[in-house]
């Protein structure tokens, strides 16, 4: 069974993924289409906060991810890998109460489920390096 937080992350991932193919539409509106009555109030609030945070910090998030792509550009990544990395990088940097290991494990699970057979390992490698060098110090104590 999926936890409310896992379902929330999946909703955010799905909104980011769909936005890649629906660029003319507002990302927040796409999220609202995904959030139905099966999501509780907190999950909806969290998902909206994540989407706002990702939108507001997208350039910085993308630049940070790009620093760790060896012989790749962000645009060459699969849509799945790119958006899993965006979601998890946001969570690593801005969601102070979520342990690093939880963020990375959840991202790996989404990548494995929706990506290629190599997506989980790829996402793990990038996020591990981002976490070690950029996650707030207090997250290492959670």
Swiss-Prot record:
The keyword Transcription applies. CDD domains: Terminator_NusB (cd00619). Keywords: RNA-binding, Transcription, Transcription antitermination, Transcription regulation. GO terms for molecular function: RNA binding. GO terms for cellular component: cytosol. One of its GO terms (biological process) is DNA-templated transcription termination. SUPFAM superfamilies: NusB-like. Pfam families: NusB. Monomer or homodimer; in equilibrium, with a preference for the monomer. Dimerization may be employed to package NusB in an inactive form until recruitment into antitermination complexes. PANTHER family: ANTITERMINATION NUSB DOMAIN-CONTAINING PROTEIN, N UTILIZATION SUBSTANCE PROTEIN B-RELATED. Belongs to the NusB family. Involved in transcription antitermination. Required for transcription of ribosomal RNA (rRNA) genes. Binds specifically to the boxA antiterminator sequence of the ribosomal RNA (rrn) operons. This is Transcription antitermination protein NusB.
């Amino acid at each position: 069974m999926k936890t409310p937080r896992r379902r929330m992350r999946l909703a955010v991932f799905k909104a980011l993924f769909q936005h890649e193919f629906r660029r003319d539409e507002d990302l927040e509106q796409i999220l609202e289409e995904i959030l139905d009555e099966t999501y509780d109030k907190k999950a909806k609030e969290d998902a909206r906060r994540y989407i706002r945070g990702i939108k507001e910090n997208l350039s910085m998030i993308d630049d940070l991810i790009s620093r760790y792509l060896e012989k790749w550009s962000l645009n060459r990544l699969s849509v799945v890998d790119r958006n899993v990395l965006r979601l998890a990088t946001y969570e690593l940097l801005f969601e102070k109460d979520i342990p690093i290991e939880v963020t990375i494990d959840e991202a790996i699970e989404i990548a494995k489920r929706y990506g290629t057979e190599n997506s989980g390992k790829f996402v793990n490698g990038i996020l591990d390096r981002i976490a070690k060098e950029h996650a707030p110090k207090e997250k290492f104590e959670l």
